[in-house]
Every structure is written in C-alpha cells, then in structure tokens.
Amino acid sequence: MQPIRRTPRGSTLLLTLAACATVSEPRSAAPAPMTMANAYPAPEDSGQRAPARYFLRRAWVQLTRDVARTRLPETVGLDLREMEQRPFAVAWLGHATTLVRAGTRWILLDPALFTYVGPVRGFGPKRLTPLPLLPEAFPRIDAVLISHDHFDHLDLASVRHLAAQPGGPPRFLVGRGLGQWFAENVGVEAEELDWWDRLPLGDIDLTFVPAQHSSGRTPWGKNETRWGGWVVGLGAQRFYFPGDTSYVAELFRDIRSRVGEIQLAALPIGAYTPREWMRFEHLDPEEAVLAHVDLGAVRSIGVHWATFQLGDEEPYQPALDLDRSVQAHAVQGFDVVPIGQVVDVPEPTPSAVDQRPSPPVATTNPEERHVPAGRRDAAN
C-alpha cells in the first residue's frame, strides 16, 4: 500500500460534471459529422443518460474516500533494458496505458502519463498509483495507438509530450474522424482507421477492431469519432487491447474468428459500478472473464483499474472480484499483475501458427486517413 494524498475536493466533480466545465480544447470549425453507433445490438435502455443524482453520488463517494488508507496494486520500476531484450512483451503502466515491445518497435496505447485526466488541465481524477517510468525516461515511441477519445484514454498533455519526443513524433493511429482533433490540438497528422482496417508497421501488423462503447469529449460531440480496440500482431503472436468496451459475446468471438488466436489480452476490469449505467460502457470483472473465454485467449491481464477513480467501487475491488470470477468459472490464465511488470506474449499454439496471417498490407487508403471529420461518410 502506498500513501497517497486525498484527492482535492472538487477535482473529481469537475470531471464528472464535465459538461459544465470550460474545456481547454477549441471546438472544431469542421462540418459536423454524422453520429456513429455500435456494431452489435445493445440493451433497449442503453441510450439513456445517467441522472444528475448519479454524478453527485459518485462525486460524494470519491471525495469522502480516505485514499491514504486505500489498498492499491503494487508498482514496480520498469526496466526498459530488460523489456528491450524480449521479442514480444507488454507492460501495464496504470489505467489503460500499455507499453508494447514488438520486435524492434515500441508501441504505446492510450497514454495517460500525468497526474490528472479531464477536460481542464490540472483538475479531474487524480492518479492514485505512480507511473513505473517517468514520462521523460520513455524510449522513443514508434507508434501511439488510441482506442477512443474519452479523456482517460486520450490525454492532451500526454500526446503533446509524445509528439515532442526527440527524433520526431511517433505515428499516431486513431479511429475514423479523430484526425481533425489531432491536427487542431496537437499539430500533427494522425492516421485514421475504421473497424477491421489493418496497417503494417515494419514486420508488425496492427488491426483496429470494434468495441461496444462510445466517444465524445464535449456535450456537443457525442459519438462523432470511431471507438475501438487494437490487435498488435508479430508473426503468429497477437496482443489484444480493447480500450473500453461493454460485454457482447459476439464481439469477442468475431475478433477471435477474424483475427485469430489471441495469446495475450489486456482486459479492462475497473470503473464498473453502478452497474445500471456502467454496464453499457464497461466490463465488470465477471464479464471480463467471459470475454477471456470468448476470445480463447491464452492469457489475460486486468487493466483499467486502481489508477484513476472513475467508478463507485473501491480501487482494489476489481482485483478481488476478478479472483472470485476466475474461480467461479474455473478459468485459467487470467490474473492481475503489478504496474510496470513486464509480461511476455505467450508462444502461439500449433493451430495459431497455421492461422498466421498473410504479410500485412494497408487496408485503408493512405490518402483518406487524414481527411478531417465531417468530410468523410460517417455511415456505420
């Protein structure tokens, strides 16, 4: 357990009531795009918004919690030299942020590298657990993969920091419609992909896959950009990162069918209460176990928990609930690991070697990847 200061009063409320905040990002002057939707059926009541009393209750729970006495996951220092020697390895850096070493490449997913996440700089949910590596000590990143534009997955300060790395910015790969935001706020081009698009990065192949979630950074920008997950492939080995998603069995089975065997998955297990609202957006630990089974994953690790307090559950509760669900379903290969621990992507099974994909080719037109949102067909 690590002593952490109590989150300043009002900082969480600013994020949970973000619609009332003054954001530090300009509103795009581009034509308004069409609204995007999930690819899989959702419950009839999934379009409802949480009432104001929910945000007030959540803010009260978080503001009155004694964080200094709260159980938190262990954080270990990340040894980049050790990780660099691994042929294909992953390190969870807290929340959804994940560093991947694949071959000779460094890939970073959903970077949130600083103290707060939220629409107002210096406010919002405060980091409970430290990064295992200071932002200034990161290796030169080859590609940054963004799952969707919610503040805890697309942090403006973090992507600006990465864009200014020595040697030039990494490639930023994002969902359809999000390139305009990067041009206006980060000053770099981002390559847009849609669901099932596949893109080469040297000998690595990257696939943008569906997720059952939503997008939007402002009250006027709901579901205008594509959300999804990523599969990072190296030969016959595959690492799956869903970003945020709710549970739809068909979604995970389709990923298994279309992409092939998943050797390692980083499945979100936190921010799942209260279920009457969170079930439309986030997996709970038991659903994460079901997703692990649906994917046929060789191994899964739990992420998206105990870093920023975004749900009503206690920070360590996801790990306890995951352990119970793993035992209840008699599942193997799914656990939690310390923040910063290097995890090897397991070797593929013989059947997975037979499923090895053809050499990656870009399945999106490079000329279309940087077209501003609103100038492309936003049909689903």
Can you annotate each of these PLM segments?
Residues 21-46, 127, 143, 171-180, ...:
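Cap/insert and terminal regions of metallo-dependent hydrolase folds
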Residues 51, 121-173, 189, 259-266:
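Active-site metal-binding motif and surrounding structural segment of the metallo-beta-lactamase
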Residues 97-103, 200-261, 279, 283-286:
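Catalytic core of the metallo-beta-lactamase
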